[in-house]
Regions:
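Alpha-helical scaffold/interaction cores of sigma-54-like transcription cofactors
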Residues: 1-393
């Protein structure tokens, strides 16, 4: 049907790749592809674009039919497919821990404590150089134990072992031997010798994910004698079932405890409200479940500022989605590309970049003759929401 940022592409909807009308649901293409986010790599004088401009579309298929899909790709694109090599590197946490023990004979207990000071940002461990700038206690320890920190910086990122990507398939426009070196794995299957980043420069990466939930839906539709596309997503019986939900088992994502509890409070009556339940079932957003439920059940709206009512009104004054953050920045005067970049920078909390963008917001407020309070609220929402807001698509 459509899941992830690819659902923000109207072209994919028209092609039938997704069944989500991005215009109807107010989704942003810039959340899928953004010029500003693209990385540039120069090799032998030729500039290659990597990352954001390359479409990343995950495909969820029946768990028990995934091999069938892979076999189809191999046959349809004979000589043009391969699995993708992964290179697992030494993380900052690991090198700090091991260097401390070997270089300065620190205890396991102390190094466990020190490595725990390095935070995660968007699920990824922060680089130790960034942690040095951002975490005062970690900086203080590194200044006292400079040999450990210096050596850890030298070996971080080195390859420790290699593997195979669990879901990705490489697809070439021509015979794949022309675009990357290949090797065989232990099962005699073809794998790219390049890692994922290099392989994607010259080929397309497809993520084919086998989900048991898709298999359950497939079997249920076969038993009933319908297709998924036959289901009316606005039918009141769907939401009546969610309203009276007693057992969430088997309902994709809602079966998780946090989502189930949010669902019982919100009592969704539309696809938009059901989507909001999933967005609320995240660590930071759980604090807003009662506010949103009060909005859906009692029509109580808690505005943060009239300037943003048209953006946050549909979610009861709660900034649930990354697209809402982008809209707020856009309304202040930024382009949607800039708004996406701003969202990412605030989430990563890079001090130098944060200061720069704070000034840019102040400048936009003055340039467009807006109240200073509007800029303050925008920044506060960005800071509060960056770590929990959900991709609406």
């Amino acid at each position: 049907l459509g899941r992830g940022s690819a659902a923000g592409s109207f072209i994919l909807y028209l092609l039938g790749v997704t069944e989500i009308d991005s215009v109807k649901y107010d989704l942003f293409f810039e959340r899928f592809v953004s010029k500003i986010r693209a990385k540039k790599t120069v090799i032998d004088g030729v500039t290659y674009l990597d990352g954001s401009l390359m479409c990343d579309i995950d495909m969820d298929v029946c768990y028990y039919r995934r091999k069938e899909v892979l076999r189809y790709l191999d046959e349809e694109f004979e000589g043009k497919t391969a699995k993708i090599r992964t290179l697992n590197t030494l993380s900052g946490k690991l090198v700090i821990k091991e260097c401390g023990k070997t270089v300065e004979d620190k205890s396991e207990t102390e190094m466990n404590r020190v490595s725990a000071l390095i935070p995660k940002v968007f699920g990824k461990v922060m680089d130790i150089s960034e942690a040095y700038e951002e975490v005062p206690e970690f900086k203080q320890w590194c200044d006292k134990n400079n040999r450990t920190f210096t050596n850890a910086n030298k070996i971080k990122g080195l390859v420790k072992n290699k593997g195979v990507h669990p879901s990705a398939i490489l697809l070439s426009y021509d015979n794949i031997t022309k675009s990357c070196p290949l090797e065989f794995d232990s099962d005699k299957e073809i794998i790219s010798s390049f890692n994922m980043d290099w392989s994607q420069m010259f080929n397309v990466k497809l993520d084919v994910l086998g989900l048991r939930t898709v298999s359950v839906v497939d079997q249920a539709c076969k038993i009933i004698g319908i297709k998924v596309g036959d289901i009316d997503l606005n039918h009141e019986s769907i939401y009546q079932s969610l309203y009276d939900l007693k057992h969430p088992q088997g309902i994709f994502q809602i079966e998780a405890r946090a989502a189930y509890e949010a669902c019982k409070k919100v009592k969704p009556k539309s696809l938009e409200e059901a989507s909001a339940v999933l967005a609320l079932a995240r660590p930071g957003a759980l604090a807003f479940v009662d506010q949103y439920a009060n909005f859906t059940n009692n029509d109580v709206y808690e505005p943060i500022h009239p300037f943003f009512d048209d953006i946050l009104g549909a979610t009861g004054g709660v900034c649930l989605y990354q697209e809402q953050m982008m809209k707020m920045a856009h309304k202040v005067g930024f382009t949607l590309d800039e708004a996406e970049l701003l969202r990412r920078i605030v989430g990563k909390k890079k001090v130098s970049e944060v200061k720069k963008w704070k000034k840019k917001i102040r400048d936009k407020i003055k340039e467009n003759n807006l109240e200073k309070e509007v800029g303050d609220i925008l920044w506060q929402v960005l800071e509060d929401s960056a770590n929990y807001s959900f991709n609406k698509s």
